[in-house]
Amino acid sequence: MRRVVRYLSVVVAITLMLTAESVSIATAAVPPLQPIPGVASVSPANGAVVGVAHPVVVTFTTPVTDRRAVERSIRISTPHNTTGHFEWVASNVVRWVPHRYWPPHTRVSVGVQELTEGFETGDALIGVASISAHTFTVSRNGEVLRTMPASLGKPSRPTPIGSFHAMSKERTVVMDSRTIGIPLNSSDGYLLTAHYAVRVTWSGVYVHSAPWSVNSQGYANVSHGCINLSPDNAAWYFDAVTVGDPIEVVG
């Protein structure tokens, strides 16, 4: 009888050890939850009125390790149930881009963690630059307002094709060829001040006034990638455009 009791005691002890070890292994196999960093800023600003292509940009205080968890914490809603997708542009910056454009004159609600903000869209003011036609056509809510002669990037410095949006408006901007790798002493070098500049890309593409290329506008592409307009046309577009308005470049 003592042998049976001793045998059962050993079996129970081994079972408890194995169970404890299994729990320990299972616990170790589950990665700890990563905390979601705090929110540094949300763009567009609360209450802003922007163009229909403006993405929602959320900047966090520190780099994000669990991107899916962060994406799940961001809530975008409109009366039209606009669909879109996330794009990470830096380790702590994510943007939500509508698949097409926001509907004009729509309220967009943005929730991030405990924050709830919102902005509105204005008219659908769309600028279309045609590389082959050498034109820049602006329409508002489907109605063409003006088709302007333009000069885009020359073959060695082509204007990128795609869908963009007006990122900022600068009454004057200094353009320095060294920022795109061209020395000032090169035959292609330049250092000049451009007026009525609307930023298209962070790499330095603008729609801007270019009195030096007026004779080529409508006929030839001679710029370093920017969309050149006459001073009058550039001033007109500068006054009409809102940050977030779509800018499309076609072949």
Curated annotation (Swiss-Prot):
Regulation of protein activity: Is irreversibly inactivated by the beta-lactams carbapenems via the formation of a covalent adduct resulting from acylation of the catalytic Cys; ertapenem and imipenem are the most efficient drugs for in vitro LdtMt1 inactivation. Cephalosporins (cefotaxime, cephalothin, and ceftriaxone) also form covalent adducts with LdtMt1, although the acylation reaction was 7- to 1,000-fold slower and leads to elimination of one of the drug side chains. A high drug concentration (360 uM) of ceftriaxone is required for full inhibition of enzyme activity. Is not inhibited by ampicillin.
UniProt key word Zinc-finger: no
Broadest EC class assigned to this enzyme: transferase
Signal peptide: 1-28
Known pathway: Cell wall biogenesis; peptidoglycan biosynthesis
A Pfam family assignment: Big_10
Catalytic residues (UniProt): 208 (proton donor/acceptor), 226 (nucleophile)
E.C. number(s) listed in UniProt: 2.3.2.-
Gene Ontology cellular component list: extracellular region; periplasmic space
MF GO annotations: acyltransferase activity; peptidoglycan L,D-transpeptidase activity
One GO BP: regulation of cell shape
Superkingdom, natural source: Bacteria
Cell compartment(s), UniProt: Periplasm
PROSITE patterns: LD_TPASE
Chain residues that bind substrate: 190, 203-204, 228
UniProt-listed InterPro entries: Big_10, LD-transpeptidase, LD_TPept_cat_dom, Transpep_catalytic_dom
Induction: Up-regulated 17-fold under nutrient starvation.
Domain L,D-TPase catalytic intervals: 125-250
Gene3D superfamilies, per database record: 2.60.40.3710, L,D-transpeptidase catalytic domain-like
Assembly with partners or alone: Monomer.
Note: The peptidoglycan structure of stationary-phase M.tuberculosis is atypical since it contains a majority (80%) of 3->3 cross-links synthesized by L,D-transpeptidases that predominate over the 4->3 cross-links formed by the D,D-transpeptidase activity of classical penicillin-binding proteins. In fact, 3-3 cross-linkages predominate throughout all growth phases and the ratio of 4-3/3-3 linkages does not vary significantly under any growth condition.
Entry domain remark: Consists of two domains connected by a short loop, which form a bent shape. The N-terminal domain (residues 32-122) resembles a c-type immunoglobulin (Ig) domain, and the C-terminal contains the catalytic site that is located in a tiny tunnel.
Protein name per the record: L,D-transpeptidase 1
Organism expressing this protein natively: Mycobacterium tuberculosis (strain ATCC 25618 / H37Rv)
Gene that this polypeptide is encoded by: ldtA
